[in-house]
Structure formats: C-alpha cells, structure tokens
C-alpha cells in the first residue's frame, strides 16, 4: 500500500499532498478490538526477505502524475477475486500519514486490517522516494507474513515522462507454512503468491495511475 513523489518545489508539494490525501481518516475504520500499538518489527537484511518489483512509465510530467495519484486509498487498492481492497484508515499519530514516524491502521474489505508506518520520504533533484513498513496483519491472506516493507521511487525521466518503481519485500513467519521451510518456503511464497496475486495488485495500482494521468480531463 503507498506512493512516491518528485520534482521541484511545486511538484514535490503536490505529490506529498496527494499521498496525505489518501490517508485521511475515513468513516467506519477504527483500531481492532484489543489492539495495542507497539513499535514496528526490526527489519531483517534484504537476503532474508522475499521481494517483487513493478514499474510503469507514464507519458505525462510529474505534476500530472501527482494529480492522478491524489485520491483515497480505497479508490486505489480495490478488492479483487484474490485479495481484499482498502475500505478506509484510522490515524494512530497526530497529523496526516506521510512524514517519517506517522502510523495508521488500514482497514480492509474482508473485515481485516494492517498497521502501517512511514519509514522515510524525501526528494533530491528529479527523484523522490517513500519507504514504509506494514505489520500487524489481521487478514487470512497474510497469515504467513510477519511484515512487509514497501518502497516507491519516482523519477521524471524527461519533460513528458515519469517512471514509478514500486518494490515490496516480505518477511515470512518462521513457525508458519511456508516460512518454516526456509529457502524452499520463500520460493513457494514467491511463485504461489507474490509473483502472481500480489504482483497483479501492484500492476493494477500502477496502471490505474497511468490511465488517470494520461486520460484527458473533461471540461
């Protein structure tokens, strides 16, 4: 779940605003019963995580891409036959979600939820990044997952094209199938879920941005 931004003072401001707009509290989403807010798990070295990357080149300048991204999460990550979508979120820290250290509960359409924290965001020249961690999964699809680390990197490659790169890395639970099988379990998780159902969700989100940015607005 999440988005990156870039380019000049105006472009960066719009992009960070777009990100925050998707994270405002929405009706009906609250912390789950018995929820206790603990610090996020320590992040393991990359060779202990299972990762997948998707990217898209959008034929529009950064500002137009930022405007296309300016919508709530529930309109970005929709329910599919394989995975739940987002139904809303609930802030755990003051202010909007986005600055490093901000946290919220993300509610899912299957009645479950996850906790998400911003780890880092920034911009330099024509590039920007946003990194975050997701844990406290309360959804059947995520039973084998201890936590996930996502990262968006956005680069304006010329005056009319912007590349968005999204990487998701998961740490599996050591005592639950398939993580209990070690390297074999990571492979099974990759080929059976990450490179299929989850990759399809990631592509759908990125293609949604591309379509929205490249479709002329009606007067």
Task: Enumerate the language-model features and the residues they cover.
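Bacterial N-terminal signal peptides
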Residues: 8-18
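Intrinsic-disorder/low-complexity, polar/charged segments enriched in Ser/Thr/Lys/Arg/Asp/Glu/Gln
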Residues: 49-57, 103, 113, 129, ...
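A short, structured loop/turn motif at beta-sheet edges
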Residues: 59-63, 119-128, 153-163, 214-216
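Beta-strand/loop substructures that line and gate deep hydrophobic ligand-binding cavities in soluble
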Residues: 137-196
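Bacterial N-terminal signal peptides that target proteins for export
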Residues: 1-9
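Hydrophobic ligand-binding cavity/cleft-lining segments
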Residues: 23-96
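Extracytoplasmic/secreted proteins, especially bacterial periplasmic and envelope-associated proteins
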Residues: 60, 64, 113, 197-204, ...
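Glycine-rich portal/gate segments that line the openings of hydrophobic small-molecule binding cavities
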Residues: 74-77, 87-149, 204-219
